[in-house]
């Protein structure tokens, strides 16, 4: 019975990974997002699964992930921010998830996610980037 449940779960996960998403990253970002997958069902908001890697030699206390949804004309339709995993050691990778509670996402929409701020352990200063401008450039260049 456990074998059947495992197969059914694996099939369900593969069937639900149907919304493509791109990474938008500032050149000097201390955190890199990889392995992004958006899972959705008809009766629940989509969920983003991602791997976050600290690309620095310093321990990070916290970071923020931002997801952008653009319509087919390149207009920003929605934006959602969420805290990432707490404490990423130097060069460490951790997986996390984010519920995308941004309303309806059409199959023709473009989704992008990235890290727009991070803070080192023991520091009051934040690294920040304007990912919206970068994401808008990508969407505009893809439209041409």
Locate each region found by the language model.
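Intrinsically disordered, low-complexity Pro/Gly/Ser/Thr-rich segments with frequent PxxP/GP/PP motifs
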Residues: 77-106
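Terminal connector regions
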Residues: 101-144
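Short, hydrophobic/aromatic beta-strand segments
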Residues: 59-65, 76-81
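Hydrophobic beta-strand positions in extracellular immunoglobulin-like domains
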Residues: 52-54, 69, 100
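Short, acidic/polar linear motifs in exposed loop/turn regions
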Residues: 54-59, 73
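Low-complexity, acidic Ser/Thr/Pro/Gly-rich terminal tails and inter-domain linkers that flank the onset
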Residues: 19-51, 55, 129-130, 134-143
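Bacterial N-terminal signal peptides
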Residues: 7-15
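Positively charged n-region of N-terminal signal peptides that target proteins for export
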Residues: 1-4
